[in-house]
UniProtKB/Swiss-Prot annotation:
Protein name listed in UniProt: Glutamate 5-kinase
GO cellular component, one term: cytosol
Residues the record lists as binding substrate: 60, 147, 159
Main subcellular localisation: cytoplasm
Gene3D superfamilies registered for this protein in UniProt: Acetylglutamate kinase-like (3.40.1160.10), PUA domain (2.30.130.10)
NCBIfam families: proB
Gene Ontology molecular function terms on file: ATP binding; glutamate 5-kinase activity; RNA binding
Entries under InterPro entries matching the protein: AceGlu_kinase-like_sf, Asp/Glu/Uridylate_kinase, G5K_ProB, Glu/AcGlu_kinase, Glu_5kinase, Glu_5kinase/COase_Synthase, Glutamate_5-kinase_CS, PUA
Keyword Transit peptide (UniProt): no
Amino acid sequence: MIEVVDGQRKLSECKRIVVKIGSSLLTANGQGLDLDAISHWAKQIADLHNAGHEIILVSSGAVAEGMVRMKLASRPTDLPSLQACAAIGQMGLIHTWSSVLENHSIRTAQVLLTHDDLADRRRYLNSCDALQNLIDWRVIPVINENDTVSTDEIRFGDNDTLAAMVAGQVHADLLIILTDQQGMFDSDPRHNPDAKLLSTVRAMDDVLFEMAGGGGVLGRGGMVTKVRAARLAAKSGCPTLIASGESDNVLSRVMAGEMLGTLFTTDKDRMTAHQQWLAAHLQTAGRLVIDDGAVEAIKLKHRSLLPVGVKTVEGHFDRGDVVECVDKQGKRVAVGRVNFSSRSAEIIKGLSSDKVYQVLGEARSLEMIHRDHMAIY
């Protein structure tokens, strides 16, 4: 049985909030955008905005709208067709959000992001600055993945993940993921009528993954992706609330203090800006398999990774590239900027610090990855 945390942070005190709304809550059962539903969401968002909260909206629905405009009976399965649908549907999606929020005298801005935008340090910082300016101007960013130019290998994969990464990027106080499910249950409610809704859990609890199910037809994100997103946000010190968007006035009620959905809390302090950028790397240049001693040194003692703790070097990378560190079971432990190329790392792996100098024949850093350039999972 999963451990449940006592108490819940007063969500009304959260100022900067990333709100992600799934496709099923914005479309008329897949038949294009539901204007009435979106207008209803706009009213709730406007209420929070006018109460002084800073709202960043991550909106799904572009592919579903594109399907209707192109009269497609089913969601495409190949990437080029999905990208084309997203490009067509994005026009209607952003126009609709702009129109309904303008009715509340709120300006919006379209922001399309790719994984490359967040993996490249300069582009990451530029997008941070742009988002901060929009927030300062009291403009609500409407964010979506730039599906048209994303490749299959480097996609976020779902807007839950994108929302979590944006939450870290803007230093959000809270991430709200609205879905067609009530929240996290202690077992699958579709098969167990006695399943109980969990009000508060620790985001980093591995047991959560054992409870998650699959995604729907229109969207890409099931409960598994939402749990993964909550963990990603938690690494940036941001809690996540997963709640049913089918509940009446859910945003207003949650921010008024009503206990709805499941709150995923974080035990970690907020990462530094540099660590948050490192954590944003879903794809890395290579991989270092490390031993149990290195895992303990990194996770429990917050030490740098030394060559002696590296068992295997995978991939081809240069000095300064971002690589991931995994344990012997392949579970990600950390990501960081490596001080050696893959060729040098292969030579010095498993060596004690005093032998590194002898083997390389030059004076340089003794750490494979310094702790200041590492984001721990």
